[in-house]
Amino acid sequence: MKVIYEDNHIIIVNKQAGEIVQGDKTGDRTLADDVKAYIKEKYAKPGDVFLGVVHRLDRPVSGVVVFARTSKALSRLNDMFRTGKIQKTYQAIVPATEKSVATPDGEWITVDTWLTRNECQNKAFSHQREVAGSKRAALDYRIIGRGDRYNLLEVRLHTGRHHQIRCQLSSLGMPIKGDLKYGSPRSNPDGSISLHACHIAFEHPVSHQVIDVTADYPDNKLWLALGGGNK
């Protein structure tokens, strides 16, 4: 666990792929557990440490995660996420497609579809029009790096649906590298998928100063070759 920013009200860390943010049926130790232990030791906190989970990243995804250290910060951050006042940026490595060859570098493309969720499969499905049980999902992406076989995309969400980036990119014929669930032909050696929450910016919930942080990239040559983090 790497701490990117901390103060009395919030703490921001760089989650590694494979870590879970909050407890699930596996019973595995969580990132929240590690952050609590860090706070307890660093500040010699007696008893239980308060830590509010504000948002999550899927287990195979890496990058920025924000936690609240006070109930005031948690309540306000929850409102900010709900009303779209948090700016999150992701980068993803996807296969280079014939269509992408004709797409100019840096040109933003909007994907606006409807997603349904299959709880049994823990998987989302994209639909071009509204269907029963679906929720609207929108994102923008652009190509910021190219290679012979893969492209590097920057992605910004307008909505925060379950597996949204993974599902919508896959529906365009661009499954994220290593994401077997959404059509990648093979897994990454470490079990990760090549999706990184690289940046977050928002107004501090208490001090109102601008918080603007970037998470270091996974130690992977392909990220470096495609220019991850340099755009």
Where on the chain are the PLM-derived regions?
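RNA pseudouridine synthases
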Residues: M1-K231
